[in-house]
């Protein structure tokens, strides 16, 4: 090998090493300067753990699941069926809604081979909207549906799909739907959907407009296929949702304030393990809670039960050991009807003047 060739090879090696070192140094420097680097690493680590748990519960092979970086970020929002502590049995006064959800949504989602007949008219809808006043059980219904169906549940927040870098949000929206298809049957749940997919206006920021457009485009991909992915939204302001979004949610359930019969069932559900006086006036309490949502009724029950508890504190002067012994030995008296008419039990919770 002549000297000229040797010199050329040496120069090539030196340039290659210099380029490699420069690239590595620049990469490390940019990674260090990136304020979201650690957050992304933590998110990916969390998503891997969630996917391992998901694979264990769904009895599926995780090795065959290929996810990109954005799908891993979305996977961090997975909620496992075993983590949901709500079932349809825990929801009082909604028998009609539960039956409709079972027949129109859950069974077609869980058994597509039975319902994907008649031109797909009996298949699971791709969109479902629950609307009604706050505290009436919309989120509980969504969780119970995921629990009962054993479907993959992705809890979507606006923060998950928004990124300060141009184009990143669109990739996250794409990842949401591609991941949902890979893990189907899947329920994509968006609470307070009106804050994210509200009516489009000329004053909307360009980035948010692109996110909405990408969301609807990917959603249309579900509508044209046989995937078992359901977009489930909950809101107390349905009129604020974009018309194009509402069109993609053919199933709409109104969850109003409970009537007298429903309030009775809700009260019975919350008080089923609470000892009551022999002549407890169910009708009186039902009438007193008129106009209250299910969550308010729960607070009324909680506050009513605090009345006999406070009596024990007054009796023992905050002696916790004596109070503990008294409660364990049955010293906590039965709940009385008048406990519900106590100022803190009803007036403070609902704003109703019961005097």
Swiss-Prot record:
PROSITE patterns: AAA
GO CC, alphabetical: mitochondrial outer membrane; mitochondrion
Keyword set includes Mitochondrion: yes
PANTHER family assigned to the protein according to its UniProt record, in alphabetical order: AAA ATPASE, PUTATIVE (AFU_ORTHOLOGUE AFUA_2G12920)-RELATED-RELATED (PTHR45644), FI08533P-RELATED (PTHR45644:SF3)
Keywords, sorted A to Z: ATP-binding, Mitochondrion, Nucleotide-binding
Disulfide partners: none
Chief location: mitochondrion
Molecular functions (GO terms): ATP binding; ATP hydrolysis activity; GTPase inhibitor activity; membrane protein dislocase activity
Residues reported in the UniProt entry to bind ATP: 132-139
GO BP of this protein: extraction of mislocalized protein from mitochondrial outer membrane; negative regulation of mitochondrial fission
Record-linked Gene3D superfamilies: 1.10.8.60, P-loop containing nucleotide triphosphate hydrolases
Protein name as annotated: Uncharacterized AAA domain-containing protein C24B10.10c
Entry's family note: Belongs to the AAA ATPase family.
Protein location: Mitochondrion
Record-linked Pfam families: AAA
Organism: Schizosaccharomyces pombe (strain 972 / ATCC 24843) (Fission yeast)
